[in-house]
Amino acid sequence: MNLTKDNIPFLVRKLAIPASVGTLFQTFYNIVDTFFAGKISPEALSALSKSFPIYFIIIATSIGVSVAGTSLIGNSIGENNKKNILYYFSHIIIYGLIISVVITFLGLNYSEKVFFLMGSNTEVTTLGTAYTDIIFYGSILFILVVSLNSLLHAEGDTKTYRNVLIISFFLNIILNPIFIFGFLFIPALGVKGIAIATIIAQLVAFIIVLIKVIQNERIKEISKEYFFIKYYYIKNIFFQSMPITIAISGYSIAATIVFTYIGLSSEYAVAGYGAATRIEQVVLLPILGINTAIISIIAQNYGANLFERVKETYFVSIRYGLFIMIISGILVYVTAEIVPTFFSSNPEVLDFSTRYLKISAFILPAYPIFFLSNGFFMALKKSENAMLNNILRNVLVPITVFYLAKYLSADFNSFFWLWAAFQWTLSLFLLLFVIYFIKYRLNKSSRVI
C-alpha cells in the first residue's frame, strides 16, 4: 500500500475500515462501563456521565499527541527525511511523558471542583472523583500508547491499534464485574473498579504497541542520541499538538455547559443524556475512522507536494461521511425508543434518552463536515485552524446556546433544537472555508515545519 500513489477512494476505505472497527470496540468499551455503572445505581450512572468531560482532558491530550506525531512523521515519510522521522518519533515520546505529568496534576487537583460546577450533589461528586482520580493516575499509559502508535498511523497502519482496542474491550468485559462486584479475594470496589479495569487494559495496550513499534524497520537505526531533547522538534510538536489539545479540550467546556443546563431538570436528565451520547458515539465511529485515514493520507501527500491528491482525499471523505450519517440518522430516529433500554430501566432516564436521540438524528449529517475538515487542517500541520474551529464549536456555540436557552426559558427539547441549528450553521460555514482554502491557498501554504 502506497499512500502517495494508490487510488484515493481505495486508500480511504483501506485505512478507515480498520480504524472504524477499532474505534467501534473503543466505544463498546465505554458502553460496557456505562452499562455496569447503571447496574450500580442511577447516581453512579450520572457520576460516570459527568466524569466524561473531565476524563476527556486525557482524550484531548492523547488526540493532540497522536495527530502531531502522525502528521509530522507522515510529512517526514513523504519527504523521505529519515533523520526527521527518528527525531520526531523520539521527541513525541518525550513530549508525551512531560504532558502526562501535567495532566495528572491538574486532574487530581481540580476534578472535584468541576463536579460541583456541574451542579452535582455530594454522592455523585464522591462517586465521580473516586473514578477520575484513578484514571488520572494512569494517564501516562493512555498518552504513551498513542505516542508510540503515531509512527504506525503515519505509515498507514491502522490495524495494530484496531487489534489493541479489540483486546482491551474483551479485557474490560472480564475485569469490570470482577472489580465492581468483587471476586474471590478482590473486594467490591464499585465505580473505582471501573477505573481499575480501564488502567489494566491500558497497560496491556501499551505492551502490545511497544512490541510492534520495536519491530518497525523505520526506527532500527534509532539510538539514545535521538532522545536528547532538541528544542526544534519539541517546539514543532508542541505547536502542532497543543492547539489541537486545547481546542478539543473545549469539548469539556461544552459538555459542562450542557450538563449544567439539563441538570436544572434533574439528575435523570443527565443520566438519560449521558446514556444517549454513548449511542451517538457508536454512530459516529465511521466518521472517526475516515478522519484517521485522511490524516495519514493527506500528511504524506502534502509532504510530497501532491496537492491534487490532498484535494481529492478531502472531497471523497466528505461524500462518504455524508452518505453514512444520513443513513445513520434515519436508523437512530427509528430506534430511539428501543436502544436506551440497554442502559437503564428507569422510565425518566429512558424518556430523556429518547428525546435527545430523536433530535440528534437531525444533527448527525453535520458532523462529518466538522470532523473531516478538522482532520484536513491537522494533516496539513495547520493546527491553528483546527483550534479555531473547535473553539467555535466547543466554547462559543455552547455559551451562546446556554444563554439563549435561558433567555427563552427553553426546556430539554428546545435546548437541543437550538444546539442543532448552531451545529449546522457552523459546519456549513466550515465547508465553505475549506473549499476556499483548497482553491486559493493550498499550494501556497507554509512549509516551515
Question: Which residues does each predicted region cover?
Answer:
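Transmembrane helical elements of multi-pass membrane transporters/channels
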Residues: 14-33, 134, 145, 168, ...
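Small-residue-rich hydrophobic transmembrane alpha-helices
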Residues: 45-105, 142-156, 160-161, 259, ...
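Alpha-helical transmembrane segments and their lipid-water interface positions
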Residues: 26, 30-33, 37, 59-66, ...
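Interfacial/gating helices of multi-pass transporter permease domains
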Residues: 37-56, 88, 122-127, 191-192, ...
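Short runs within selected transmembrane alpha-helices of multi-pass transporters and secretion channels
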Residues: 66, 135-153, 161-172, 194-209, ...
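Helix-terminus/linker motif at the lipid-water interface of multi-pass membrane proteins
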Residues: 28-46, 115-122, 180-189, 249-276, ...
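Transmembrane alpha-helix boundary and packing residues in multipass membrane permease domains
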Residues: 19, 23, 34-35, 71, ...
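Short alpha-helical transmembrane segments in multi-pass integral membrane proteins
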Residues: 1-18, 73-140, 188-242, 298-363, ...
